Amino acid sequence: MRLDKLLTELGTGSRSEVKKYIRSGLVTVNGEVVKKPEQKVDEKNDTVCFRGNQLTYTEYEYYLFHKPAGCVTATEDNLHRTVMDYLTDTARHDFFPVGRLDIDTEGLLLITNDGALAHDLLSPAKHVSKVYYAKIDGRVTEEDVNLFENGVDIGEEKPTKPALLEVLHSGDNSEIRLTITEGRFHQIGRAHV
């Protein structure tokens, strides 16, 4: 990998800033000052330092993030704060959230730069379960549980795949845990229990 590309990926600066740092002698590779941004380095075996601090390259990184209500599950948005706006400890720009939670929904999200893992987690063919906890208005009954076991009509051509609805508390305000293996647009909110 080119030295300037490596430093950019590690969040040292923009490509043009990194080139200036390298040409200024602020970067060493295996203890030697390097002034050519295009120099090839082995990111796994070479020791690269910037201003005397050793840099460590990891191809993939993973963050578990508790998304608060009020922010959107997106990499950028002109109207709302995004989950990416909370990642202050990284300057890498290749991260993305895996899956979606509605703006008013809070919950655990995986944020990564590992596209293959994201595909495996989101692909309907892989049948990876997603678990939701929800507080809802109204009483949840055994009939509702059976409805989810058979798939729910959410106003699309096909009903949802079967899901596991667990009633944690049933009353005027109920609490449920719902386990699904697909993720359709607003699926949880559109499944009127």
Locate predicted features:
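Basic, flexible Lys/Arg- and Gly-enriched helix-loop patches that mediate nucleic-acid binding at interfaces
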Residues: M1-H192
